[in-house]
Swiss-Prot record:
Native species: Panchlora viridis
Record lineage: Eukaryota, Metazoa, Ecdysozoa, Arthropoda, Hexapoda
One GO term describing the cellular component: extracellular region
UniProt cross-references to InterPro entries, sorted A to Z: Periviscerokinin
Function: Mediates visceral muscle contractile activity (myotropic activity).
Protein name: Periviscerokinin-3b
Record key words, sorted: Amidation, Neuropeptide, Secreted
Length: 12
């Protein structure tokens, strides 16, 4: 998720 949410995805 770009804006975040579950599991810390690469928010780049």
């Amino acid at each position: 998720g770009s804006s975040g949410g579950m599991i810390p995805f690469p928010r780049v």
